[in-house]
Amino acid sequence: MTSAFEFDFYNGFSPNGDGKNDYWNIPILDYFAENNVTIINRWGNEVWITENYDNLINRFEGKNVNGDELSDGTYFYILEYNNEEKRGWVFIKR
């Protein structure tokens, strides 16, 4: 079975409304519809969480769970799918 550890994806995006890189694209999840994605700020607080991330509608656009824009900077993620977990960072720059 395919593993996320075999795939690279961009760690940054620019949700500024210009139509380019406005959301965090995670291509591997196109193959694993059942997944969980959690975004954590530098203080360890979960700021965004979802099930079934799909890169189309259900995707991280640099906003928290209330729809407020997050500050530019580095955030951490936990990606869970297919009984695997990947952790890393993602950078927001508007």
Question: Where on the chain are the PLM-derived regions?
Answer:
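Short loop/turn motifs at secondary-structure boundaries
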Residues: 1-94
